């Protein structure tokens, strides 16, 4: 059963890189899925299906071709001019994500606790550097452990929230633009995720790739579906702002918001670490 343990670890590292500030706060769910009403849940399933398929495909191909960096991987599937362009864009996006997580955490610390934004940004940077300097084993173990904490906190808080509030869900905007929104959501997230999957491919094989993709599918469907439902329970009842789930927690109690802010912090950290580690492999 060792392959199942490896599959779970790989899935954890992959998920920890996907679940950033936008996911944990619910802003991505709100923007990419909630505005399509009941059709939004179809978008959730489509997005997660794409994530799981891409995870399997990249892991399997990278392992077969022994392409353990995004540069090596892209050289196998793209011609040189396009390969260089996509590679450069991916690394630029990683730098952007790293910067966004730092500034985002600084903003959250200021909004929730009145702490200076610079302090929050520096704290995020220091934590990221410490984890990256631990090397591959430190990166994998830290990301997989934090992914468990993220899933448990988000899942636990969301189930608690389900016990109060409005249960009405409106059906509106029933058109196939929900599919385009789902594809767009997965597309920009995979820019950095591919780099991490290539790094993880050295520890995988076909069976591991399949099971890790299945684990990812189950976990992401659960998290995204319950968050989508909760947003609909409270949309129109309170001002959801740019951090819907966190706002809903604050609506219930400050203690719940503090607990959930841990998940947001861990999510920002793991996303920042994923980008930083992929960049460290490059440079």
Model-derived segments and their meaning:
Residues 5-24, 93-94, 98, 161-165, ...:
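Hydrophobic, membrane-embedded alpha-helices of multi-pass small-molecule transporters
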Residues 5-7, 32-57, 210-225:
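Extracellular loop-to-transmembrane helix junctions
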Residues 7-17, 42-53, 84-95, 111-135, ...:
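Transmembrane alpha-helical segments of multi-pass small-molecule transport proteins
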Residues 19, 40-44, 75-87, 146-162, ...:
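Small-residue-rich segments of transmembrane alpha-helices in multi-pass membrane proteins
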Residues 57-113, 261-283:
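Hydrophobic transmembrane alpha-helices that form the core helical bundles
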């Amino acid at each position: 059963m060792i392959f199942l343990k490896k599959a779970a670890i790989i899935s954890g590292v992959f998920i920890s890189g996907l679940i950033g500030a936008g996911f944990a706060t619910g802003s991505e769910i709100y923007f990419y899925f909630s505005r399509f009403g009941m059709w939004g849940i179809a978008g959730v399933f489509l997005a997660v299906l794409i994530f799981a398929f891409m995870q399997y495909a990249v892991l399997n191909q990278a392992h077969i071709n022994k392409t353990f960096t995004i540069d090596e991987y892209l050289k196998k599937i793209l011609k040189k001019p396009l390969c260089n362009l996509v590679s450069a864009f991916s690394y630029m996006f990683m730098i952007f994500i790293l910067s966004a997580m730092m500034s985002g955490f600084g903003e959250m610390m200021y909004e929730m606790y009145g702490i200076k934004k610079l302090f929050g940004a520096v704290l995020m940077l220091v934590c990221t550097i410490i984890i990256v300097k631990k090397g591959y084993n430190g990166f994998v173990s830290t990301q997989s452990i934090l992914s468990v904490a993220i899933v448990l906190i988000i899942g636990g808080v969301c189930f608690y929230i389900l016990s109060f509030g409005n249960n009405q869900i409106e059906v509106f905007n029933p058109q196939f633009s929900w599919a385009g929104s789902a594809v767009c959501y997965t597309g920009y997230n995979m820019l950095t995720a591919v780099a991490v999957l290539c790094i993880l491919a050295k520890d995988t094989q076909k069976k591991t790739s399949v099971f890790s993709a299945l684990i990812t599918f189950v976990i992401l469907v659960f998290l995204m579906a319950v968050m989508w439902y909760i947003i609909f329970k409270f949309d129109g009842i309170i001002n959801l702002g740019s951090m819907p789930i966190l706002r809903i927690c604050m609506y219930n109690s400050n203690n719940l918001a503090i607990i959930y802010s841990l998940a947001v912090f861990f999510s920002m950290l793991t996303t920042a670490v994923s980008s930083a580690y992929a960049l460290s492999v490059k440079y």
